C-alpha cells in the first residue's frame, strides 16, 4: 500500500483508534525507539487506548492489505524485520495495572514498564521476575523469556505468566491460559509476539522476606583476576544467589556518582534471597580480593531494578550476546583485554544462569530453559565517524573469544534481525510454526524474531 493510502490523523470508528500516517505531526514520536540507530518506517501507526481500539486497528490494517506488529516501549526494536507494508500498533497507552497481593498475581496492560510495578510490589514484600532495567516493557520481556536477579531461584518470567490477552490476526479478542487455548498459550510464553497483538498479561510474583544485594567494584585492570575468582565460585553457589560480572566504562558526566565518574571497573553484582551475612560468606572468595568499593547491603526488592546500572535514556548502540555452557578459563585473559577497551565497548557482562533456568518444568512454555550456565552480553555506543565499524569489530572479537563455549542464543538479548529458529530446538520450532499456521495462516502478525506460518502440506 502506498503511504498516501493512510491519510491524516483520523478515527477508524466513532470515538475509536487514531491512526498516523507518515508526515503527521506526532509521527516521529510514535515511531521512536530506545536504540537511536534504529529508524523505523512503518506504513502507518495505530495508537490504541484500549482493547477495542486494537481490534479496530487490526481490522483496518487487513482491509488495506497491511500486516501488523506491536510495540510498547521500543526496546528490542532492532530485531524486527523491515516495516514496509506493516502497521505498527503502539501499545504504550495500555497502562492498566492490577495487583492481587493475596493471590500473588499481577495483571498489566501491554504498555506497562517494570518501573510502574516493581516499587508497588516491594511495598507488599513481593517481587516480579524482572530483568536488569526498570524501563523495559513487561509484555515484550515476558513473551521473549525474561531472565533477571531472581531467575536462578524461580525460573524464566515467561513461565510465571498465567494468562495472555490478545487480538488475533482475524480480529478476535481472546484470553488464553492453561485451560483455554493451551497450545496458543504455550507458544506465547517464550515464542514472542508473532501470534497476535497482546493487550495484557497476567503473571505470578514471589514473596521476598529478606534480600541482600549490591555490587563490589574493582579497578578494570583486575578484570581477569575477578573473572577467575568468580568462575571458580559458581559451582558452589545456591539458587538463591545470583551473581553477574560487568566491566563498565562510566562516562564523565555530572549525573554519574563521583566515585565512579569517568572511570572503568570490573564489578561483581549480587542478589541473594537471604541475610547479608550469609551472602558475604558465600561471596568470600571474591570479597577477599579487596574491592575498591563495597556496596553489598540489605535491600528492598525495588533495588533490583537499578542493580545492573543499565542506562534509562535512549542511546545509539550495537550489541552482541550468547549463552555459554561456561566461561572457559583459557579465554579469560582475552575477554579481559577486549572488555578493557573503553574506546569501543561501554559494557561487557557475564550473568550466572543455571539453577531454575536450567531445569525444564512440565508446565513450561515454548522457552522452558536456557541451554547454558553463563549469559554473555556486550554493548558499544556508536558515536562519531567510524564508530560503527570499530564497535562492530570489537563485539565480533568478544563473540569469537567465547565461541568455544557457545551453547545457544537468548532471543531477548539479540537486537538485530535473526533466524528465530536458532533460539529453539527443532521440535519446539516445528510446534511454534504449526501454532502460527493455526492462528495466523496469512502471516498477518509480525513479531520480533518472527515465527512464520508453516506451509501446510
Feature-to-residue mapping (PLM):
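Soluble FAD-dependent oxygen oxidases
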Residues: 1-457
Amino acid at each position: 500500500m502506498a503511504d498516501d493510502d493512510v491519510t491524516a490523523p483520523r478515527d477508524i470508528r466513532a470515538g475509536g483508534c487514531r491512526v498516523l500516517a507518515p508526515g503527521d505531526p506526532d509521527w516521529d514520536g510514535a515511531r521512536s525507539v530506545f536504540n537511536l540507530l534504529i529508524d523505523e518506517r512503518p506504513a502507518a501507526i495505530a495508537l490504541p487506548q484500549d482493547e477495542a481500539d486494537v481490534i479496530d486497528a487490526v481490522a483496518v490494517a487487513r482491509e488495506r492489505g497491511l500486516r501488523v506488529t506491536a510495540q510498547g516501549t521500543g526496546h528490542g526494536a532492532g530485531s524486527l524485520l523491515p516495516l514496509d507494508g506493516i502497521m505498527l500498533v503502539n501499545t504504550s497507552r495500555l497502562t492498566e495495572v492490577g495487583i492481587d497481593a493475596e493471590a500473588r498475581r499481577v495483571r498489566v496492560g501491554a504498555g506497562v514498564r517494570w518501573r510502574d510495578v516493581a516499587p508497588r510490589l516491594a511495598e507488599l514484600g513481593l517481587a516480579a521476575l524482572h530483568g536488569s532495567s526498570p524501563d523495559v516493557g513487561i509484555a515484550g520481556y515476558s513473551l521473549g523469556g525474561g531472565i533477571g536477579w531472581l531467575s536462578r531461584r524461580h525460573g524464566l518470567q515467561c513461565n510465571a505468566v498465567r494468562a495472555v490477552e490478545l487480538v488475533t490476526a482475524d480480529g478476535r479478542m481472546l484470553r488464553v491460559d492453561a485451560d483455554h487455548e493451551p497450545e496458543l498459550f504455550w507458544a506465547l510464553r517464550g515464542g514472542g509476539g508473532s501470534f497476535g497483538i497482546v493487550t495484557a498479561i497476567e503473571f505470578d510474583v514471589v514473596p521476598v522476606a529478606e534480600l541482600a544485594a549490591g555490587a563490589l567494584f574493582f579497578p578494570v585492570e583486575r578484570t581477569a583476576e575477578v573473572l577467575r575468582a568468580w568462575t571458580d565460585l559458581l559451582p558452589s553457589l545456591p539458587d538463591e544467589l545470583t551473581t553477574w560480572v560487568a566491566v563498565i566504562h562510566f562516562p564523565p558526566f555530572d549525573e554519574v556518582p563521583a566515585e565512579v565518574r569517568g572511570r572503568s571497573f570490573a564489578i561483581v553484582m549480587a542478589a541473594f534471597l537471604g541475610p547479608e551475612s550469609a551472602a558475604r560468606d558465600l561471596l568470600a572468595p571474591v570479597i577477599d580480593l579487596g574491592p575498591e568499593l563495597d556496596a553489598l547491603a540489605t535491600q528492598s526488592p525495588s533495588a533490583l531494578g537499578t542493580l545492573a546500572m543499565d542506562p534509562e535514556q535512549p542511546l545509539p548502540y550495537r550489541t552482541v550476546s550468547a549463552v555459554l555452557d561456561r566461561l572457559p578459563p583459557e579465554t579469560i585473559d582475552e575477554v579481559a583485554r577486549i572488555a578493557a577497551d573503553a574506546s569501543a565497548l561501554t559494557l561487557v557482562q557475564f550473568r550466572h544462569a543455571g539453577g531454575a533456568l536450567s531445569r525444564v518444568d512440565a508446565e513450561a512454555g515454548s522457552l522452558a530453559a536456557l541451554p547454558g550456565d553463563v549469559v554473555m552480553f556486550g554493548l558499544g555506543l556508536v558515536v562519531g565517524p567510524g564508530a560503527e565499524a570499530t564497535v562492530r569489530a570489537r563485539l565480533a572479537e568478544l563473540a569469537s573469544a567465547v565461541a568455544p563455549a557457545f551453547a545457544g542464543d537468548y532471543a531477548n538479548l539479540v537486537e538485530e534481525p535473526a533466524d528465530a529458529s536458532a533460539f529453539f530446538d527443532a521440535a519446539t520450532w516445528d510446534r511454534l510454526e504449526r501454532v502460527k499456521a493455526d492462528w495466523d495462516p496469512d502471516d498477518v502478525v509480525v513479531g520480533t524474531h518472527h515465527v512464520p506460518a508453516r506451509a501446510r502440506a
